Curated annotation (Swiss-Prot):
<comment type="function">
    <text>Implicated in ras-dependent oocyte maturation induced by insulin/IGF1.</text>
</comment>
<dbReference type="InterPro" id="IPR035676">
    <property type="entry name" value="SHC_SH2"/>
</dbReference>
<dbReference type="InterPro" id="IPR051235">
    <property type="entry name" value="CEP152/SHC-Transforming"/>
</dbReference>
<protein>
    <recommendedName>
        <fullName>SHC-transforming protein 1</fullName>
    </recommendedName>
</protein>
<keyword id="KW-0727">SH2 domain</keyword>
<dbReference type="InterPro" id="IPR006020">
    <property type="entry name" value="PTB/PI_dom"/>
</dbReference>
<feature type="region of interest" description="CH1">
    <location>
        <begin position="228"/>
        <end position="369"/>
    </location>
</feature>
<dbReference type="Pfam" id="PF00640">
    <property type="entry name" value="PID"/>
</dbReference>
<dbReference type="InterPro" id="IPR000980">
    <property type="entry name" value="SH2"/>
</dbReference>
<dbReference type="InterPro" id="IPR006019">
    <property type="entry name" value="PID_Shc-like"/>
</dbReference>
<feature type="region of interest" description="Disordered">
    <location>
        <begin position="281"/>
        <end position="315"/>
    </location>
</feature>
<dbReference type="Pfam" id="PF00017">
    <property type="entry name" value="SH2"/>
</dbReference>
<feature type="domain" description="SH2">
    <location>
        <begin position="370"/>
        <end position="461"/>
    </location>
</feature>
<dbReference type="InterPro" id="IPR011993">
    <property type="entry name" value="PH-like_dom_sf"/>
</dbReference>
<dbReference type="GO" id="GO:0007169">
    <property type="term" value="P:cell surface receptor protein tyrosine kinase signaling pathway"/>
</dbReference>
<dbReference type="GO" id="GO:0035556">
    <property type="term" value="P:intracellular signal transduction"/>
</dbReference>
<dbReference type="GO" id="GO:0005737">
    <property type="term" value="C:cytoplasm"/>
</dbReference>
Amino acid sequence: MNKLSCGRKSRVEGGQLAGDEWTRHGSFVNKPTRGWLHPDDKVMGPGVPYLVRYMGCVEVLQSMRALDFNTRTQVTREAISLVCDAVPGAKGAMRRRKTCGRSLNSILGKSNLKFAGMPITLTVSTSSLNLMASDCKQIIANHHMQSISFASGGDPDTAEYVAYVAKDPVNQRACHILECPEGLAQDVISTIGQAFELRFKQYLKNPPKLVTPHDRMAGFDGSAWDEEEEELPDHAYYNDFPGKEPPIGGVVDMRLRDGAAPAVLRQSPNHMGATLPVGQVSGAEQDSRKMQPTLQGRERFPVPCSRPPNRPDLFDDPSYVNVQNLEKSRQPLRAANGQRDIFDMKPFDDALPSAQAIVSMEDQLKREPWYQGKMSRKEAERLLKVNGDFLVRESTTTPGQYVLTGLQCGQPKHLLLVDPEGVVRTKDHRFESVSHLISYHMDNHLPIISAGSELCLQQPVERRQ
């Protein structure tokens, strides 16, 4: 393996390490031989603050998982270049990058320079990357670590910049750019690496119950999902019953009622990466010390949040099956020690402007290649060829209802994704969006349990242009 040096890249892909400054220990990695820069309890608690400049963000149109490492690096560099060219006073003395082998036009979208050039306090913890304006203390963003996919910093060509990809309701998936004082970018990216490692160690000691398929089945005699029934002429709808009304506009974005959606993070070329699940909230202190290599996390959200208890049963439409066991399983997951599961992430509602945070589910889904729009059951089934094929469509009988259609053991299955209040959920967990739900099960290779059978999401059926 190559030694980690200023001009070389060291990375972690899917938990596999590169660079012999890092070693493998059990199911995760040891810290670098020189040690981390900060005490573990500080990173796990209030977090480590850095004074940097927020330079804006550039929309990323494709999942980082679909790109190879070199392309991810090129995307990061190009995003930094675009922002530096657009923001007056940016440290633009970067050496011109070599052109990427593939065009980035289809990967990078529009820029958002709303807070460009603003001095901020970046607080790095095992919970999140918190971006707060230094003068007015306004929180620009709070990107939860479990939504981080890739981070990059201290590259020779972009030595004073840190870039990471995150997903939020305002910018969707975007590459956020931070300008650091001289020599600080390496420290920032190293601290992010430390936070990921600590978070992963917490994860190993106290894994969320949801990731164990056996536990998901234990004591379960119904379905974790509501299945779509056949489209019959006498189909019963919610407004067939006194006091029952369909959701206004199809669905209500419940994420914004309980909090904002999580974010996605990206990694740096010269440093280390680690694919780690994370989640929780942090405070802010003042201090700045130095750091080390980069790390890579999972772009999509690894762990969904639990559904609040005592919410009335929403799936009471007689056309849906296996709904009798919904209520009793909605209690938040608890860790083995009796404490609340640290991966039961609590949505944040103060990280982004509420007025701008409203993004319709339809607009979000149109960005996903596996979303087909309005489509009947039979049309959807004709598109499924092999086991593991899946797509998401809007129901032709219930506007605003989205259905996951997949093929398992040669049999098509149709699963409802959204309850009448617009919440995307399973029997005992809710997700920030349909995209969150799909990527969670794909990234973690977890089957969806329904009526005692499993549905695995392996090959997305992309819509025809």
